[in-house]
Amino acid sequence: MPSAPSTPPSKRKSKFAGFGKFFKPWKWRKRKSSDSFRETSEVLERKISMRKPREELVKRGLLVEVPEEDVSIPSESPPLRNGHMSVEHANPPEDIGGLKRKTRQDSTGSRPKSGETTVQPCATAEVAPVEPCTATEVASVQPHATAEVAPIQPLATAEVSPVQHCATAEVAPVQPRPVSEVASVQPCPVSEVVPVHPRHLSEKNSEKYRPMSEVAPGASRPTSEVAPLQKVSRDFSKQPLLPPKRPLSSSSSVTQESVLGGQKPDPSTRQQSSVPVPTPRTIHPLPFSKQPPVPPPKPQNRSSNPLMAELSLALGGSTLSPAGSRPSPPIPPKRVVVPSTDAVNNKEKALRPASLPPIPANEISIPSPPSPPISSHIPVSNPPVPMLTLAPPNTEVEKEQSASPLPLHIRIQQALNSPQPLPLLDSSQRAQSLLFMQNEVPSEEGTRVRSLPVTIELLKVPDDDDDDNSLEDESLSPESSESHPSRVYIGDVPSVTVIPNYLPTCVQEEEEEEEEGVSDTDSEGPVLYREDDEEEEEEETSSLANKVKRKDTLAMKLSGRMGPHDSNPEFPQRSREEWNQIRQQIGSQLNRRLSQRPSAEELEQRNILQKNEADRLAEKKEIKRRLTRKLSQRPTVAELVERKILRFNEYVEVTDAHDYDRRADKPWTRLTPADKAAIRKELNEFKSTEMAVHEESKHFTRFHRP
């Protein structure tokens, strides 16, 4: 058959052709979206629309706005303890990679031997001379070349105790200088540096550290030479700096200038050689991203400070040591004669110098106004110089320390600056540390007059227990300090000075402009919500709570927020039109949200809204009433049977039966023949009426014989 091969085999009917109906290939049809899915999406959309947008939260002050660009200097560095800045906030992370390399070299490389101290580079900008020096001065004081040149190298290994290599990582990078300049400066000989191992400290305390009273006042430079530094600190008012915490810093920076007098200025300073150059921010702790926490500093090597070494050189071998391990809170750049470098203060902060034993906290008190770089503090135009006096100390070495007063020119300057003293205090009323209270409720104090006295805490070997105890003491101090907010001891007899902080409007505007440029960002970027009860007195907390509070960035940021009673920048004064506009905006938002709300019926249908009890009872009553009406109008079963409405299989008769013995083979349980006949008759009748049947076949329908 020729036509057979041409026929396609698919047309043949197979015996499984019917299976195609059941096993069809899967076709993707657009499925109708289910009701539950649609309802869920509506609920989610409604919830999302009810959320407040971020801008609104920021406007209402519940969220702090974090700007997009990463500003390197945080506007607010919450102080941890008496004026310390936290590691995360103190400095911008500039060249972390290079710094890590240097740190690794430093930790693996040279550690200071017992007799000598290697002074590593500090900062570039320190090289600038403040006054012209003659060649003889340059010859007499050899320049500390390495100490001020290398671009981003960490601090002196002498300043970092062998246990404490993490501290090296906290040095802030400075702008690198050309290699030619670095090479041209000659290194500092070891002979100029004071040996600083604790071993030697204990042995040579009596010889090395003479009190400053034994040093002639001419040993440190007179006020006329110090004067150019006012412009220096004014230039630096734009940087967050931690100003002098002790009288040491004033004389130390003076000596630093004298030592640095012969140095070659770096390129930035050559341009403005006529103007004195700012003393640099040499070190701030640098926030490292992935670095273990810094171990607590060990008591060794604590005064090994290049500036301290220079100071000892300039003062003819007598070395001053910082009075107290915990510096008081920051003082703004002075327009008066208190030159200082942050380098000194930061080094002392990070490394806890302990060249002299502790001074009790209640014997030293220093007035210090709030600092400018932190946004919640307001700068001060012309505050008096910090003054320090020592009451009779306990140990012999403390007596040595207490015998060293301020240099004469600084005391004269203090006397000129401070107003006339008020009546004397009894010695029990000492200036308490307002530090923690101030940070709990700092306020944007326009041009108000306020002052912040602060005690310098004990200088101890920083064990954890000591830290916690001193923190608790500080946190308990505000009650007594509130009663005497502006008292300070000057000289041997405690007298009182009032330190007014009058704020000129021009300075205030400048600082506000600077603060606007500075961001609130934190290394972790916590979401900051307002606390309404910030101003309440903080209760006594455990040492663990104090530790957590020190480390918790969110708590630190919240502690720096403004109290609600202050003139809050987040809620500025608005005109009536602005308020009306805001009300209209809120009203339209509320209307939109109300229109999106589901109705009560919707919610009831979805079992979200439960009816209240009264409604439920009323509904039950209504149902009962309807049922009873229906039942009362129903005809009885007998009536329905009579009217042939109900048939045999359509009803069940309910009879009341007495309890009886259901066991079989009782004569009264057996059906009598009459009962059986009645049953048969009924069944036959039922069957005969069930279907129409021909007469001749009717006998087939009999169910039982009659």
Curated annotation (Swiss-Prot):
Placement of RPEL repeats on the sequence: 42-67, 588-613, 625-650
Polar residues bias spans: 106-121, 266-276
Bias-annotated ranges (Pro residues): 290-299
Cell compartments where the protein resides: Cytoplasm; Cell projection, Lamellipodium
GO BP terms in the entry: actin cytoskeleton organization; closure of optic fissure; enteric nervous system development; negative regulation of integrin-mediated signaling pathway; neural crest cell migration; neural tube closure; positive regulation of catalytic activity; regulation of cell cycle
Region spans: Disordered: 65-123, 196-380, 385-404, 459-579
InterPro entries: RPEL_repeat
Ranges of compositional bias, category Basic and acidic residues: 200-211, 563-579
Keywords noted in UniProt: Actin-binding, Cell projection, Cytoplasm, Developmental protein, Neurogenesis, Repeat
Pfam families hit by this protein: RPEL
Acidic residues bias spans: 463-476, 508-523, 531-541
Main localization (coarse): cytoplasm
UniProt keyword Repeat, yes or no: yes
A Gene Ontology molecular function term of the record: protein phosphatase activator activity
GO cellular component: cytoplasm; lamellipodium
Database matches in PANTHER family: PHOSPHATASE AND ACTIN REGULATOR 4, PHOSPHATASE AND ACTIN REGULATOR PHACTR
Purpose: Regulator of protein phosphatase 1 (PP1) required for neural tube and optic fissure closure, and enteric neural crest cell (ENCCs) migration during development. Acts as an activator of PP1. During neural tube closure, localizes to the ventral neural tube and activates PP1, leading to down-regulate cell proliferation within cranial neural tissue and the neural retina. Also acts as a regulator of migration of enteric neural crest cells (ENCCs) by activating PP1, leading to repression of the integrin signaling through the rho/rock pathway.
Oligomeric and partner information: Binds ppp1ca and actin.
Family membership noted in the UniProt record: Belongs to the phosphatase and actin regulator family.
Protein name, per record: Phosphatase and actin regulator 4
